[in-house]
Amino acid sequence: MIQQETYLTVADNSGAKRLQCIRVLGSNRRYAHVGDVVVASVKDALPNMGVKKSDVVKAVIVRTRHTLRRNTGNSIRFDDNAAVLINEDKNPKGTRVFGPVARELRDKNFTKIVSLAPEVI
């Protein structure tokens, strides 16, 4: 579960390395899960890339340490909390996605991120 002040690792090559969640988008929502969009601040970034430190960006959650339960009875959990930066059209800012992503992204119409990911769990 991602909430305000949560630190996230960035799972793409947009230039940012770490994010801090500012707000979970939605009507008065407190927690974000896989596939939810958050507003975040860039805390660490690579020089000469698309984003800079202290930029405010939108990101979609692709991995969480909180257990994700599926309708089939399975449950999965990842090793970190990770997000992918997106633009206003909900397309990823980077051209590559690192690490596995959850299958729930396909249900929430983030098919471009799913197609870029090396593994979908």
Curated annotation (Swiss-Prot):
Belongs to the universal ribosomal protein uL14 family. PANTHER family: 50S/60S RIBOSOMAL PROTEIN L14/L23, LARGE RIBOSOMAL SUBUNIT PROTEIN UL14M. This is Large ribosomal subunit protein uL14. Keywords: Ribonucleoprotein, Ribosomal protein, RNA-binding, rRNA-binding. Binds to 23S rRNA. Forms part of two intersubunit bridges in the 70S ribosome. GO terms for molecular function: large ribosomal subunit rRNA binding; structural constituent of ribosome. Part of the 50S ribosomal subunit. Forms a cluster with proteins L3 and L19. In the 70S ribosome, L14 and L19 interact and together make contacts with the 16S rRNA in bridges B5 and B8. NCBIfam families: rplN_bact. SUPFAM superfamilies: Ribosomal protein L14. The gene is rplN. GO terms for biological process: translation. InterPro entries: Ribosomal_uL14, Ribosomal_uL14_bac-type, Ribosomal_uL14_sf. GO terms for cellular component: cytosolic large ribosomal subunit.
